Amino acid sequence: LGEGVSLVRDMFVADTMEEAKEKAGEHMVNYMRWVCHWRGLGNHMDPGEELPETKGKLDLLNYEFLHKRNMLFGTPEYVIDKIKELKSELNLQNLQVWSNFPGVKHEDCMKSIKLFTEKVIPHFKDDLDTEVKKVS
């Protein structure tokens, strides 16, 4: 079927796990409330996973629910480990990161991107395909 998997992941890199949650966590959850209002939580669940019954379809949507499923929010080391896990489990070929969320301060977003480019990406330099390809 192909050589690997391409994924989009929400990303916020900070000096500590707590800082990532504090500076971007609630903004991410608020954004996902809007997205999941239409799509539900199914895109964030593992195959075969069943959630407990709740009154509202988004009652379980919080930072902890999202973080363990598809967020690259945390220290550079945490993000590196999560990317390695995705590569190992899914034969990850391409990773695209969504790095700005409504409400996150510009300077916090820029620091996160800087940490990602300076501390995370170098760990995957052998995997980078820098060839420019013509799209027809």
Map each language-model feature to its residues:
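An alpha-helical appendage that flanks or caps ligand/catalytic pockets
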Residues: 1-92, 125-136
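Flexible loop/turn segments at secondary-structure boundaries
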Residues: 14-16, 103-106
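Short amphipathic alpha-helical segments at helix-loop
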Residues: 64-67, 101, 105
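Conserved residues at the C-terminal ends of beta-strands
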Residues: 98
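C-terminal helical cap(s) of enzyme catalytic domains, especially alpha/beta-barrels
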Residues: 105-129
